[in-house]
Amino acid sequence: MPKLERPGPLRERVYEALLELITTRALQPGQHLVESELAGHLGVSRQPVREALQRLNTDGWVDLRPAQGAFVHEPTEAEADQLLSVRTLLEAEAAKLAAFSIDPGDGIEKLLELCDRGEQAVRDDAVDLAVAANAEFHAKIMEMAGNAVLAELAEQVGRRVRWYYTPVARQRGKQSWAEHRELIEVIAEGDGYRAAEMMRAHTEHTRRTYREQVRAQDA
């Protein structure tokens, strides 16, 4: 766990550092979060860590249990299912708008570049890099859609999508990036309705994979 770099508001940097560790699952769901240990790892005092944990609790990332302390939130199947369903709606609309955009040119090149990067990460079994490339890929399509309200809504759920995607990234692997390449072709052709259909199927695959993995772990 790297120590924080200066400058910037300390409480904000501690919050972001802990949130990134949770999102990438460096801190696992259900893991006990000890203030003194986190403070030592980040090279700060316990006060900003305590404030960050309280904020993370408010935002639903951390559970504060009386007489026990702080724990990384363990998402229920229903929570994950609901959020990933909303993600499907947002991303399908974004894919449609991106395909209907007047000149997707530069965006298509960027999407292809991200596909190359994601496929290389899969070959290298670099899960964190694959997850990051996946997030950038979907964010780029959202940007190409050109709808600020849609982008704002997607940003609100984006970090949790990464949280849920990380444990299935290796399993989705090559298939996910193959679906990305098919989607790029349809967007480049300007077929918005087919792009929406393909994105809907793509995100549903991820949702089902996550649900199946959770159920297998609970069995």
PLM regions: where:
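Short linear motifs at protein or domain termini
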Residues: 1-100, 207, 211-219
